[in-house]
Curated annotation (Swiss-Prot):
Pfam families: Cuticle_1. Sequence repeats lie at residues 3-20, 27-44. It comes from the Eukaryota. This is Cuticle protein CP459. Disulfide bonds: none annotated. InterPro entries: Cuticle_1. It comes from Cancer pagurus. Calcified shell. One of its GO terms (molecular function) is structural constituent of cuticle. The lineage of its organism: Eukaryota, Metazoa, Ecdysozoa, Arthropoda, Crustacea.
Amino acid sequence: AVLLKGPSGVLFEDGQKRLLPPGVEIVLLTESGAVLSNGENVQF
């Protein structure tokens, strides 16, 4: 899950930090990961 979300990045509960390019959003968030609008997958 997302612990903190700002305009330029996301901090996930497991400690992962992900910088988000301008205009990229989280489009799907599940217990095991997230899919970003640029097609990237983040697993946690």
